Amino acid sequence: MSDRLFIFDTTLRDGEQVPGCQLNTVEKIQVAKALETLGVDIIEAGFPVSSPGDFESVVEISKAVTWPTICALTRAVENDIKVAAEALRYAKHKRIHTGIGTSDYHIKYKFNSTREEIVERAVAAVKYAKKFVEDVQFYAEDAGRTDNEYLARVVEAVIKAGATVINIPDTTGYCLPDEFGQKILYLKEHVSGIDNVTIATHCHNDLGMATANTMAGIQNG
């Protein structure tokens, strides 16, 4: 287990997906300042390409807070990444969070693609993001349902491409704590270069296991 834990707060991005919880820019700035006061390390401020409002919020939050890293979400799409970089232009500490689905369900039914093509798209996205910022976080969407051997292959490839943070999401709230902890441990034991990056978790609460899975990830990472 690492001696240093970082708190990554996604209230202003993923939290807004809760029905009825949309915030305007002024309200988002108030939340961001409160998170800074609490000592949150990274604030995921939004998904800039998704709407003009999200773009504006990331810009204004970047101006309003001082020491937390401001993170912007993207898909593994060049225009997403370019727009995110523009939204982060005023951030003192900036991070682009890019990624792609890695489970066979996503590969086949969402992307109509192959495992090989997904690796290529993941690597290309990280390399493109590195043109704008040094701190690049990669998410393997639906990692909870991705077999560990293939997940390790993707993670190793994006680390070689320059990713500084690896996010392992349980997107569908599928995993039990033992299973999720073992997934993190597998990556620690099988991915070259994993000790040179930060491992992040993003656990959904469909089965009420988000906190337990997060703690299992910490114990094994």
Model-predicted regions and their roles:
Residues 1-2:
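Basic/polar N-terminal segments that are highly enriched at the extreme N-terminus
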Residues 5-7, 17-43, 55-64, 78-199, ...:
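Alpha/beta enzyme core
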Residues 10:
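Flexible glycine/acidic-rich beta-alpha junction loops that bind and position SAM and/or redox cofactors
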Residues 13:
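Short, ordered coil/turn segments that flank beta-strands lining enzyme active or ligand-binding pockets
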Residues 40-48, 71:
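Divalent metal-dependent hydrolysis catalytic cores, especially in the metallo-beta-lactamase
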Residues 48-53, 75-78:
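Short active-site-proximal "capping" loops at secondary-structure junctions
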Residues 67-74:
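A glycine-rich helix N-cap at a beta->alpha junction
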Residues 203-209:
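Active-site-adjacent loop and "lid" segments of alpha/beta metabolic enzymes
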